Amino acid sequence: MDTETLKKNLQEKMEKALKVLDHELKGLRTGRASVNLLDSVIVEAYGSKIPLSQVASISTPDARTINVQVWDKSMVSLVEKGITIANLGLTPATDGQLIRLPIPILTEERRKELVKLAHKYGEDTKISLRNIRRDGNEELKKLEKNNILTKDEHHSLSEQVQKLTNDYSNKVDSAIKQKEQEIMTV
């Protein structure tokens, strides 16, 4: 493996870790209605587990309500069950094939819990970044050991890997800070 491919692979892995964090943060409730809140809802139907978005259309008519329009009338109770099982703290109110999910106002205590959870997600992502960095550095050591890299090249590339890790770590910090502000805004 050449060094350019190695750097590209490390960057792709770090980008994936950042996307996972972004997806996890979108799932945190901020007190505002967002269709992303229901991304984790799975409905057991037709003998398999199906994402909610494949059995209903989801909309946000206002900042405090999510509407779930179920396409198949026989699925309404299964969709309700899926929303309840997802443990999002939302109480479904059914009206025919329309399920309304009023978004409760977040208490100060709940906001602090969500901020802690966001920080945990951030720390988990940073651990992933450090593991990716470690793997990259081990690969560089192998290349040096096999006389493909000189000691100076190894040192220079290690610094580049560290800089890449620092850049992504800063992106994690800024994503967490932004989410924290979003959560704490009343």
Curated annotation (Swiss-Prot):
Biological processes, Gene Ontology terms: cytoplasmic translational termination
Compartment(s) of residence: Cytoplasm
Top-level taxon of origin: Bacteria
Pfam family, one: RRF
Molecular function via GO: ribosomal large subunit binding
Gene3D superfamilies (UniProt xref): 3.30.1360.40, Ribosome-recycling factor
Keywords: Cytoplasm, Protein biosynthesis
Keyword tRNA-binding: no
Family: Belongs to the RRF family.
NCBIfam families, sorted: frr
Summary of the function given for this chain in its UniProt record: Responsible for the release of ribosomes from messenger RNA at the termination of protein biosynthesis. May increase the efficiency of translation by recycling ribosomes from one round of translation to another.
Protein name: Ribosome-recycling factor
